């Protein structure tokens, strides 16, 4: 049976932690849709089109990965794509409470939808997009925190490093 999973997020920007989860989830599922959220509640540093492009560049050698954007309820997006599994990353206990609530909310909207949680590898456990945005705002180095193609993309587009 073909299993399609969705890994949703704002990916503002894509981190090594995100890529860790993407690589591992893509080995578990037949198709992994990395779903870039057009967030109504967050003001992103990078526009949706740039976040999608960074993901496409970083996942171009992952044949089972598709990058798509969405601005609907995640449960509806999953149903439209025939996905029955959501993949979420957990870095710390503080992530768990939020993710548990979101998992229950999505299951209440789509009872066929399961959420699985993957922990990033230890070297990526501290990385978050918000930390990277803060470093970028202060013109710091991010090359050890993001995939090389993302670092190059940001350097070319933002000239802020």
Curated annotation (Swiss-Prot):
Pathway: Cofactor biosynthesis; coenzyme A biosynthesis; CoA from (R)-pantothenate: step 4/5. It is found in: Cytoplasm. Its EC number is 2.7.7.3. ATP binds at residues 10-11, 18, 89-91, 99, 124-130. Substrate binds at residues 10, 42, 74, 88. It is an enzyme of class 2 (transferase). The keyword Repressor does not apply. CDD domains: PPAT. It holds the Pfam family CTP_transf_like. Disulfide bonds: none annotated. It catalyses: (R)-4'-phosphopantetheine + ATP + H(+) = 3'-dephospho-CoA + diphosphate. Its cofactor is Mg(2+). Signal peptide: none annotated. One of its GO terms (cellular component) is cytoplasm. The record marks 18 as: Transition state stabilizer. One of its GO terms (biological process) is coenzyme A biosynthetic process. Keywords: ATP-binding, Coenzyme A biosynthesis, Cytoplasm, Magnesium, Nucleotide-binding, Nucleotidyltransferase, Transferase. One of its GO terms (molecular function) is ATP binding. InterPro entries: Cyt_trans-like, PPAT, Rossmann-like_a/b/a_fold. Belongs to the bacterial CoaD family. NCBIfam families: coaD_prev_kdtB, cyt_tran_rel. Reversibly transfers an adenylyl group from ATP to 4'-phosphopantetheine, yielding dephospho-CoA (dPCoA) and pyrophosphate. Homohexamer. This is Phosphopantetheine adenylyltransferase. The lineage of its organism: Bacteria, Pseudomonadati, Campylobacterota, Epsilonproteobacteria, Campylobacterales. The gene is coaD.
